[in-house]
Amino acid sequence: REQACDAAAEMESNRLLQEMNRVRTQRQKRMLTETDTLTETANLLVDTYQESPDTYEAEAPKAVKESLGEQAEQAYQVMLVNCNSYTDAIAQYNEERKDVTVNFLTTQDYTQVGISSIYDPVGKQFSFIVLLLP
């Protein structure tokens, strides 16, 4: 009976894993457009880089932390360089250029994801800051 329970639990966890991968793959195939909200954009970015090897935990940027208080525990920052506009940033993301750098955390321990975006016209950098709110 115990073995049967273990087998059932393993089947269920495999099914969940397959479902997660299916959803992730579906999202990755979708191109971003200008009509996408920042939330959709950030979710797509997070999903796409979820398996990225060059990831590490990042503190929420100071300005963001101050505006949100202690809620914002951590953040991923997605930075797109050489952008003249949000449209450029989207085009660059869709082309998957090498100058897209992503620092991310897994969102599974968080109930909410807040989004902030910063465009620096001088440095022509566009940052998406994805806040993880516990």
How should each PLM-predicted stretch be described?
Residues 2-68, 111:
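Short, well-ordered surface patches within globular domains
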Residues 62-134:
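A well-ordered secondary-structure block
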